[in-house]
């Protein structure tokens, strides 16, 4: 099991450059959104890292320059940069130029190719100490083409992984499908990833505040902003009878089911999520052993997992999260007086053996 490089929370937002990872299949609207970032007078200094193997360059005329490094200053103060070899090298180059005052930028947006799995891109920011001390992942944003998504999700595991990794999902082209089709798609996406809010967008017109500073990779911030972030909608029933949570915008008819009854889906996606909850504290040593074991065995299939834990021996919440084999934890705020100390964990992955996970977590309690 590999450990994430974790910078102490108090230092984290002061010095680090936030990074947004943008994913989505061909035609989902990534390029439209990036063009807006690079052309609008939004007052932010953003460095956009565009993948050279992307389907469509931001603007071929602008990017054809003599510069070997393919770094171009845009008229609105943003920077566009094309990955030549390796994302890590590109990030180091940008950081070095910023330190020498050769480039000015406040944040980075990385475009992945349509067929990319965002996992390895995200892992770059935890595996390399120099990168982890310079940058902080803010969020992974996935654009989903409402017209073609049902087929893409059926056919391509990369599309399902992009949904599983997302902190925010934007649905494009909803004007090309019926209301029922849109609702069915939202229901399907929520089944795969209950954490990510879903919002319909038109021609990449997304308010910047919904793209930047989401802090999807920092649970502490999210809990401070939204104390209900890890609460299930309107019910306190126990974890064994529920496979996934539903978003507020989901009015699919099959949600009018009796509590505790399973759902029947016409599709069987391999990316699924489940939630574990307990009011008993965890034994730190037992939990570490169990998580280490499952990450070693199932890590490649564990897309995102995170939670707030009640640990024996501390009066503070323990914030835990991981991407594939990389796992990290942090001390969060104090448990409030009179607050029920409930641990809650969300796992999103590919065909994960839910029963093994739940049983192992139960056995890790005090």
Annotate each language-model stretch with its function:
Residues 11-13, 168, 177-336, 340, ...:
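C-terminal accessory "lid"/substrate-recognition subdomains
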Residues 15-152:
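Nucleotide-state-sensitive switch-loop elements of NTP-binding domains
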Residues 150-165, 169:
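Flexible active-site lid/hinge loop adjacent to a nucleotide/diphosphate
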Residues 1-13:
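Short, Lys/Arg-enriched N-terminal segments with co-localized hydrophobic residues
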Residues 47-49, 104-109, 135-144, 163-174, ...:
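Conserved beta-strand/loop subsegment of P-loop NTPase cores
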Residues 64-67, 159, 215-219:
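Short, hinge-like loop/turn segments at secondary-structure boundaries
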């Amino acid at each position: 099991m590999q450990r994430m490089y974790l910078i102490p929370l108090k230092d984290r937002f002061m010095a680090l450059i936030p990074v947004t990872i943008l994913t989505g299949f061909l035609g989902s609207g990534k390029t439209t959104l990036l063009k807006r970032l690079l052309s609008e007078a939004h007052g932010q200094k953003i460095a956009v890292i565009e993948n050279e193997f992307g389907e469509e360059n931001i603007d071929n005329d602008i990017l054809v320059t003599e510069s070997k490094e393919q770094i171009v200053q845009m008229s609105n103060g943003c920077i566009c940069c094309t990955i030549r070899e390796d994302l890590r090298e590109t990030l180091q180059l940008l950081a070095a130029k910023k330190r020498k005052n050769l480039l000015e930028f406040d944040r980075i947006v990385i475009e992945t190719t349509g067929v990319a799995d965002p996992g390895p891109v995200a892992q770059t920011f935890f595996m390399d100490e120099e990168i982890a001390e310079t940058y902080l992942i803010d969020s992974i944003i996935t654009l989903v083409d409402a017209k073609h998504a049902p087929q893409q999700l059926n056919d391509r595991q990369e599309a399902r992984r992009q949904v599983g990794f997302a902190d925010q999902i934007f649905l494009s082209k909803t004007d090309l499908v019926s209301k029922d089709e849109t609702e069915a798609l939202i229901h399907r996406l929520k089944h795969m990833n209950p954490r990510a809010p879903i919002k319909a967008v038109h021609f990449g017109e997304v308010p910047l505040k919904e793209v930047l500073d989401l802090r999807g990779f920092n649970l502490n911030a999210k809990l401070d902003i939204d104390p209900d972030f890890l609460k299930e909608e309107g019910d306190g029933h126990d974890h064994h009878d529920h496979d996934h949570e539903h978003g507020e915008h989901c009015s699919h008819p099959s949600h009018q089911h009796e509590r505790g009854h399973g759902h029947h889906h016409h599709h069987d996606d391999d990316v699924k999520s489940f939630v574990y909850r307990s009011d008993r504290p965890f034994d730190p040593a037992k939990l570490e052993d169990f998580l280490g074991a499952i990450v070693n065995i199932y890590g490649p299939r564990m897309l995102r997992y995170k939670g707030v834990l009640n640990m024996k021996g501390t009066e503070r919440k323990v914030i835990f999260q991981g991407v594939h084999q990389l796992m990290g934890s942090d001390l969060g705020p104090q448990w409030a007086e009179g607050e029920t100390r409930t641990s809650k964990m969300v796992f999103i992955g590919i065909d994960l053996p839910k029963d093994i996970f739940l049983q192992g977590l139960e056995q890790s309690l005090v």
